[in-house]
């Protein structure tokens, strides 16, 4: 298990790697990766934290667990690798973006552009077995990603948390610092998007908050590849 985070998350999260829960998780993952197909690739597990440093995090979009189909997951919530069909929830995110800003829906679901601007695309569970959603639930990742949220909660500079759906909203209890902002609605999944995701304007809400803070706004437009 690669556990060296090369930016400022490294020292902040170093104590987690020594804890009993993480040792058990690492043993479990070693076994899983050697006996099953697991996503994402080992070197991509911590991509959300690698792309978006602690200091540079402006926004957090919380997901659940990685996509479990071939070549989809690469360590960023909701994002898929280039050349892979855009999944339904992300397509609905793009439709809302089109309605807010008039952007064309891109031909890909590769969200690295967001991550590089300070949007932490964090799943609460960072690995999954091929074809088995939630197969790595309850193995220790939740402790680790809760710590990520707690560390952001401790930060002086405000963070905007986007919580879509009940799973993400359950993490509200970790966000106790009133400096931070929470934007929430139902999940963009086709099962729920029409019950309050469409029309919720999360992207422009984020940029209004950032502008009021004197911060650079997020350019949400994803280019075609």
Swiss-Prot record:
GO terms for molecular function: uracil DNA N-glycosylase activity. Its EC number is 3.2.2.27. CDD domains: UDG-F1-like. InterPro entries: UDG_fam1, Ura-DNA_Glyclase_AS, Uracil-DNA_glycosylase-like, Uracil-DNA_glycosylase-like_sf. The active site is at 65 (proton acceptor). Its main location: cytoplasm. Pfam families: UDG. Belongs to the uracil-DNA glycosylase (UDG) superfamily. UNG family. This is Uracil-DNA glycosylase. The lineage of its organism: Bacteria, Bacillati, Bacillota, Bacilli, Bacillales.
């Amino acid at each position: 298990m690669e556990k060296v985070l090369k930016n400022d998350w490294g020292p902040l999260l170093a104590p987690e790697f020594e804890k009993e829960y993480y040792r058990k998780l690492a043993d479990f993952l070693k076994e899983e990766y050697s006996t099953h197909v697991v996503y994402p690739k080992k070197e991509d597990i911590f991509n959300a934290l690698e792309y978006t440093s602690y200091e540079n995090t402006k926004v957090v979009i919380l997901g659940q667990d990685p996509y479990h189909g071939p070549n989809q997951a690469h360590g960023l919530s909701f994002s898929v690798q280039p050349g892979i069909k855009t999944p339904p929830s992300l397509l609905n995110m793009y439709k809302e973006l089109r309605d807010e800003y008039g952007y064309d829906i891109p031909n890909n679901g590769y969200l690295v552009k967001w991550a590089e601007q300070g949007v932490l695309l964090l799943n609460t569970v960072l690995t999954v077995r091929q074809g088995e959603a939630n197969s790595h639930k309850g193995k220790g990742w939740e402790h680790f990603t809760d710590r990520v949220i707690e560390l952001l909660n401790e930060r002086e500079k405000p963070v905007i948390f986007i919580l879509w759906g009940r799973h993400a909203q359950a993490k509200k209890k970790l966000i106790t610092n009133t400096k931070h902002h929470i934007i929430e609605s139902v999940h963009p999944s086709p099962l729920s998007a029409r019950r309050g995701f469409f029309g919720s304007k999360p992207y422009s809400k984020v940029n209004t908050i950032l502008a009021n803070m004197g911060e650079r706004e997020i350019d949400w437009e994803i280019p075609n590849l």
